[in-house]
């Protein structure tokens, strides 16, 4: 899920009828790459008490989320609507990415009443009238030299504009932990996260270090795993982690402060037990 065709799939598969017949009233849908999204009795209770047909979870923005989609209110209809950055006019980009003007972003965790969704899908013959988003891609996402193509898609969260009684709810950052790039994967695999005995993320203030891996060597998962053969470095003491060039990491590497590795122009190695800081591989005297 994540794209708008999830609603058509639910309709055509007959799953909505099956769920209703089993006594289900609500659906929770999230992006499959959001590792923080999970059923919540607290959030579901808030949705049930709201009486709304549709609810979107939003979270506070950080600088890293400036380009994320946001829930705004339509001047024409007064309804909530999803605005992705690809849909923002160039003249409005600065305001749209200002976290003081738009402090929340769309997590794409949604809650919807099955009965209301069925009525809407029936009205539109199984295909909701969602705005089309244009994205530039390559035929092979792992090879930027392949043919350029235009991908047309719709966003699941855009359905918020079709429900007049739709609402938003602010949730903690722990409910939005997406893995879309290998930069995200570094954080999720690091010691900045801890699982409970129920294999859920521990509650906490999830302020992440800024990660920038050289896309020439780390963009694809095969290349990423080859260069982190043991595990990713410790990021517990890191504000940021930047890797320029082709570096392979040994065991028990620790990053601190604004850790930075420069491109040496050749394949390079971070030895076991090393400390990486602003000056590259450093001694452990910082402790």
Language-model region placement:
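Left-handed beta-helix
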Residues: 45-287
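Conserved beta-loop-beta/alpha segment of the NTase-like Rossmann-fold superfamily
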Residues: 1-67
